[in-house]
Structures are given as C-alpha cells and as structure tokens.
Amino acid sequence: MERFKQKLQAAAIPFRENEPLAAHCTFKIGGPAQLFVMPENEQQLCSAVALCKEQAVRYYLLGNGSNILFADEGFSGVVIDVSALDAEIAVEDTVLTAGAGVRLAALCKAALKHGLSGLEFAYGIPGTVGGAVYMNAGAYGGEMKDVLTTVRYLAAEGEVREVPAAELDLRYRHSIFEENSGCILSAQFHLQPGNAADIRAKMDELMAKRLDKQPLDKPSAGSTFKRPAGAFAAALIDQCGLRGYRHGGAAVSDKHCGFVVNLGGATCADVLALCDEVRAIVKEKTGYDLEKEIRVVR
C-alpha cells in the first residue's frame, strides 16, 4: 500500500488514511477505510481506478452513501469518493448531462430552472447521479430509466465508453453496472418542456410526502427491503407486528416500517441481525421472502 500511496501523491490525488466510513454514509455506521481517495475531476478518478487495478488493490466506488451499510471493521483497501468530483450539469434544449458526483437534488433543481419536466419523482432521493443510475433509483411511480438516454463510464478494461440506456438492463433497482464493474462518469437525461410552477408544485408535493411518511430525522439507508411481487415490504412488516422492533441500536422505524433506522450507536451487526429477524418472521407469517435493498460493503 505504501507504493500505492506514493503514486497517488505523485499524481496529486487527495487521500486520507483510516477514514471513518460512518461519516460518509447516511446510516452513520461503519469502520475505517484503509485509504479514502477523493479525486477532484474525471481524470483523477480514472487514474485512481487504473492505479488500483495496476497494483491489484481492492477498491469500492462511493457516491453519497445513501444506500450503503459499511461493515463495523471497515474496508480493507481503497474507497474512492466519487461525490467529491466536479459537480457539473450541462443543459441543451431538453437534454441534461450531469457528472456522476452531481447530487440528485441539484439535478432536479437544474431541470426546474430550465422548465424541464420528468425528474420530479427524484427530488428528495438522497444520493448522486452515479449511484442513482447504478441502481436505477426510483420513487412515486418514476425511475431513472424513464428519462435516462446515455451513460459514459470507465470500463473494466480501462477505456471510456458511451452506451445507450437501452443496453444497460435497467429494471427494478438494477443495472448492468452491478455485474460489469464499470465506473459511471456521467449520464444524459431527456426531459420534456413543462411549466416551472407546475414542476415546482409537484416537487414540493412529493417532498411533503417524504417528510410526512419517512423517518428523515434518523440515520438510515432508505428503503431497507425491495418490493416483493404483489405486495409492499413495509405493509408486510407492519402486518407482522414489527413496527418499532429492535435489535441493539437498530430498529424498524415507528414512522415507516420499510425503513430500518439507527437509534444511536447502532452497528452493522445490529442492522444485519435485525434484517435477518424481520425476514424470518415475515417469511413464516406471510410466505414472502424479503430481499435487502441496502448494499452491505465489507
């Protein structure tokens, strides 16, 4: 790792050692990253990834950390913070192009500023453009695949490619990037001309719903379980009497049963044990086998 650090320094790529990962995810859980790399532009990102491969160093690409549960022991290897990249948004007619590190909130506000409709559903989803494309994020009847047209990414072979959204196998909380280890660099979205007042009203309406129904006052990673076919995870959990159910510092939210929250001092082990208990009870009582939506990074 010393050789790796020397090369980062030579390339003027910022990094920290033993960086607490709890500070870089919305769950506020996780031990230290051996190295935490903070590329400031696309070139530095590509260089950092290439260096990891050259030195056979294990790495993980991190956006806003809004769908992540880091292990208590941390991450042995390199965590690359994509959210530190230049947050650039370009608008041309009805097309928005955004870097992977752009926050979804900023993307939605850019669309509003230019009177473009189609991203209202994403307002209030925590995270970055890269993370949202990676998992085909969605809410309130909309998904990224509805407006995504093309993606630029760094392929495993080291070359930058641009592919149409149709080739990304976009479906419920899934994209091809889960399998091909590509690093998303930027994405392009096609929107529709709209009335700014109507767009603003829709964004405000959906944000009000979030504030009313979701436990945004407590650390979490958003929806904990994927929606099973023909049902809703939160309803099944509530039906089984698990509202407020606890394990250590982790609990099923009293406000929304689809969320597991950190009540203070929760560990990764607490969250995983709670999820296992909830899954077992729901399976026994309803027959549904819940699948975790949050990503566990060890």
Language-model segments: residues:
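N-terminal glycine-rich flavin-associated loop
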Residues: 21-57, 71-116, 143-162
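N-terminal flexible segment immediately upstream of the FAD-binding catalytic core
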Residues: 1-38, 42-43, 76, 240-261
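Acidic, glycine-rich active-site loops and adjacent beta-strand->loop/helix elements
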Residues: 66-67, 84-86, 102-104, 125-129, ...
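Glycine-rich beta-strand-to-loop/alpha-helix junction loops that act as flexible
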Residues: 62-66, 100, 263
